[in-house]
């Protein structure tokens, strides 16, 4: 099963690398193929200080955890996503959170499930009839 991973999933995996999310990312090779876009890297960089403060983990350990997690995720160049999928994604999330557009667009592009811990996004997309969004428990 193809699964697009959004930023809050990686954020959670770094905060608790031995938790359920970290376990799914690191030990599900035969069940799931994980994908994301480079926007995830930008968001993690933007929130690095917050991640460091919340986790109490130093910079080198955060970098190490990212490297381990990223070895299990295929990064797709957002320039390869068709403009129609960008537009459709934007239309789906513009009233929720425009920052989720790249992840929704990639899900549309590769016809994959979107794995998110964002309850607001999950609820709003499901209300719009989206059936390809998953929570950690559903995964």
Label each residue range with its predicted role:
Residues 9-10, 40, 103, 120-121:
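Alpha-helix capping/helix-boundary segments
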Residues 17, 47, 127-128:
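Residue-level signal for well-ordered alpha-helical positions
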Residues 20-23, 52-53, 131-133:
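Glycine-rich, phosphate-binding/catalytic loops in enzymes
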Residues 74-113:
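Active-site neighborhoods of divalent-metal-dependent phosphate/nucleic-acid chemistry enzymes
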Residues 108-139:
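Acidic, PIN/NYN-like endoribonuclease modules and their adjacent C-terminal/linker elements
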């Amino acid at each position: 099963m193809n699964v697009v991973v959004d930023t809050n999933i990686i954020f959670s995996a770094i905060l608790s690398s031995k938790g359920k999310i970290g376990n799914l990312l690191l030990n599900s090779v035969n069940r799931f193929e994980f994908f994301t876009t480079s926007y995830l890297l930008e968001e993690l960089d933007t929130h690095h200080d917050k991640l460091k403060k919340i986790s109490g983990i130093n910079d080198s350990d955060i970098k190490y955890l990212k490297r381990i997690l990223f070895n299990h995720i295929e990064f797709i160049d957002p320039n390869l996503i068709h403009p129609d999928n960008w537009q459709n994604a934007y239309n789906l999330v513009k009233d929720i959170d425009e920052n989720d557009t790249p992840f929704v667009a990639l899900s549309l592009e590769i016809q994959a499930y979107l794995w998110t811990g964002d309850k607001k996004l999950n609820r709003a997309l499901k209300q719009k009839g989206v059936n390809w969004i998953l929570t950690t428990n559903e995964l």
